[in-house]
Design a protein with these regions (language model features):
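C-terminal regulatory domains involved in ligand/effector binding and gene-expression control
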Residues: 1-75
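N-terminal cationic and glycine-rich segments that engage phosphates or anionic surfaces
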Residues: 78
């Protein structure tokens, strides 16, 4: 069994950069369905946001990697989040 880093508990952080508000959320999940449900919950909570940029890495070998740029230029939002998670070996 491979040892991997994961999120201990649900958390959030907020930062304001040049009048733009960025809010990050993380939550431990084991399946894509759990991740999708969490993403929908956040989208509903922030339905007035210009962009909601979800990303997920799931599996002990990081088998599932997915992200959306949600209207931002392709590869500029979701993909960097996945790269950060995988480089830190964070999954689930």
């Amino acid at each position: 069994m491979k040892v991997y880093n994961t999120v201990a508990k649900e958390a959030s952080a907020e930062q304001i950069i040049e009048k733009s508000r960025f809010i990050a959320y993380v939550k431990p999940v084991s399946t894509k369905e759990e991740a999708d449900a969490f993403i929908e919950q956040i989208k509903k909570k922030h339905r007035d946001a210009t962009h909601n940029v979800p990303a997920m890495v799931i599996g002990d070998k990081m088998q599932l990697q997915w992200a959306s740029d949600d209207g931002e230029p392709q590869g500029t939002s979701g993909e960097p989040i996945v790269k950060m998670l995988t480089s830190a070996e964070i999954t689930n």
